Amino acid sequence: MGFPLTDFLTYGDDGQPIFDATFTDGRKATSYQDYLRVLDEVTQICGNEDDAPLSKAYVQKLAKILLQKYQEHLRDTQNDWYGKNNPKLYTVAKQLEAFAFLTGEQEAIRGVLEEFPLLNSIKCHYEDYQGDNFLNKVDPLKFKNFDRDLLTLQMMIRVLDPRYINQRDDQVCGVNAFVHNMALFNPLKYVKITAELAATGVCDLKEFAGKEGVLRIEVTQAVANKKSSAGDTLHDVD
């Protein structure tokens, strides 16, 4: 049994949303890794049905909070990734762009770019997703039992730490090193493919195969409506 996201979102004295979670041992969640551990237990956005119309707004607030917390981590570890010829620079830029693709978040991304200007050397299109992003779309998903807002949250977790991919006992897809490595080296590509599969059930991996139609994924209706061994519907991104 999981928790609703709203159990962990509150507001500070300045009116800004904050993430407030405590582990069972009494320790407060403080690092971005702590945040991800807590969020991995979230199974719905709103605990109260009356709050359902605000679901997307809660996920949007979370995206900003997560990126600000991740910025602290980037600051603490910049010797490991922040360098003109460091390949991790590209990964971080694509993590930010993946967040833009998923939620349209701009302010927190600008904050990271201002602190780490070398990221601007990586070609990205952050602003393109401000109005047109995965979270804001209203089309039904191919996976009928999926919730778009929850799926967005789950992908954000995996963008920041691909180790959360395929951690379930029952999955729509089996353990796949290809997917893990994709999220690790190009997070934007990972979320685009996952989002397309969830939305339409079809994805052509022409970038990997060299041309269209050679490497194509198509989800059958049986898979889209798959149930776990316990009999309940599958509803997480894995």
Where are the model-predicted features located?
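Active-site nucleophile-adjacent alpha helix/oxyanion-hole segment immediately C-terminal to the catalytic cysteine
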Residues: 66, 82-88, 92-106, 111, ...
